[in-house]
Amino acid sequence: MASSNGLSLQEIADLVGGQLLDFSDCINDETNSSDGAVQGKSPSVEISSTICTGAAPPAEAGPQQITLIDQANHAGQLADSQAFAVIAPEYVAASPIRLQILVDDPHAAFTKLVSHYRPALGETMPVSGIDPTAKVDPTCQVHPSANIGANVEIGPGCTIAPGVNIGAGCQIGADCTLHPNVTLYAYCQLGERVTLHAGTVVGAHGFGYKMVDGRHIPTAQLGYVVIENDVEVGASSTIDRGTYGATRIGEGTKIDNQVMIAHNCQIGRHNLLCSQVGIAGSCTTGDYVVLAGQVGLKDHIALADGVIVGAQAGVMDDLAPNQVYLGSPATPQRDQMQIMAVQRKLPEMRRELKRLTQRIGRLSEALEEQSADIDQRKAA
């Protein structure tokens, strides 16, 4: 997400209390100092003065933006990133990005930087009415009780129903319908022909906490939500904003009532998510995925294209393409049907096991008695 609040690389380093170094000469050298440590150099004035237009996660950062890596062994995340600089806790040798700002706490530094580029995030809801800086197409129908925040842009043909709240910086494409009491937090983006049913909340704070002195302290949730064209979201569903970048709902996806999608999730195109589905943070789904009612997904897993997951399944691992999965933990349909067939026989199997155990007990007693008789005869 680009910003007009551009900073030079040196200004960013000063803002976050880091050291800006250029490691371009270290690409082919594991070390370049007498003590074996890799030594970057201070970049030229020209490079230090380069303006950075925004901050985003590696996969989202553009060529004039800066990104983040919290551990050197996560360098693979930077392989396809377009960012021209990275904030890191130490020199990242495997990084293709050679301009690095080294800091003690990358997340704290990145939080400060993202807050600079998106300062209105805390001003999520307008006080009342339509902010004078908002741009609402004259063909829109906006109920008088709706609230529209600063710098919001709403395209032609949209319908904004009673009680809708649209936070600062949101962008809404043509022919969208927001039913009563829908809430969009700051910087959310809707494509064209998006329908959000009553009570839906888009862009709320992600469920992220860290333990500090025995207390759960909220972590920064400074991202936003992108909902692409022709998406429909049912009543009272919730889609949390990303930590730094976007939680994304792909084109044509249909989401039922009371569905929960957590921060950083990337939902593919033309998915069907049925009622009470719960998707934990940083999950990815491919295209044409179907999740039946009350399916739950563990965080940081990926479902490939064409996956179908049956009702009430619990998904704990990545799922292969074009397969049907059932049960908890979710397993391929054929395997789960065999498990279910055995489960139905468990009461009968338990009774049979009890009978066999009793029979073995009687046989064991008889053998012991027979053995004792043989011993007595031998003794006589």
Curated annotation (Swiss-Prot):
**GO BP, one example?**
lipid A biosynthetic process
Q: Where is the active site?
A: 263 (proton acceptor)
Entry keyword set:
Acyltransferase, Lipid A biosynthesis, Lipid biosynthesis, Lipid metabolism, Repeat, Transferase
Reaction catalysed by this enzyme:
a UDP-3-O-[(3R)-3-hydroxyacyl]-alpha-D-glucosamine + a (3R)-hydroxyacyl-[ACP] = a UDP-2-N,3-O-bis[(3R)-3-hydroxyacyl]-alpha-D-glucosamine + holo-[ACP] + H(+)
InterPro entries, sorted: Hexapep (IPR001451), Hexapep_transf_CS (IPR018357), LpxD (IPR007691), Trimer_LpxA-like_sf (IPR011004), UDP_GlcNAc_AcTrfase_non-rep (IPR020573)
GO terms (molecular function) for this protein are: N-acyltransferase activity
Give the PANTHER family listed for this entry.
Answer: UDP-3-O-ACYLGLUCOSAMINE N-ACYLTRANSFERASE (PTHR43378), UDP-3-O-ACYLGLUCOSAMINE N-ACYLTRANSFERASE 1, MITOCHONDRIAL-RELATED (PTHR43378:SF2)
Enzyme Commission designation: 2.3.1.191
| PROSITE patterns per the UniProt record, alphabetical | HEXAPEP_TRANSFERASES
Q: Which HAMAP family match?
A: LpxD
Name of the protein in question: UDP-3-O-acylglucosamine N-acyltransferase
Q: Name one GO cellular component term.
A: membrane
Q: Quaternary structure?
A: Homotrimer.
Could you tell me which pathway this protein works in? Bacterial outer membrane biogenesis; LPS lipid A biosynthesis
The cross-references to SUPFAM superfamilies, in alphabetical order and at most eight, read: Trimeric LpxA-like enzymes
CDD domains reported for this sequence: LbH_LpxD
Top-rank EC class of the record's enzyme = transferase
Q: List the disulfide bonds.
A: none
Summarize the protein's role. Catalyzes the N-acylation of UDP-3-O-acylglucosamine using 3-hydroxyacyl-ACP as the acyl donor. Is involved in the biosynthesis of lipid A, a phosphorylated glycolipid that anchors the lipopolysaccharide to the outer membrane of the cell.
Family recorded in the similarity comment: Belongs to the transferase hexapeptide repeat family. LpxD subfamily.
As given in the record, the signal peptide range reads: none
Q: From which organism does this entry originate? A: Rhodopirellula baltica (strain DSM 10527 / NCIMB 13988 / SH1)
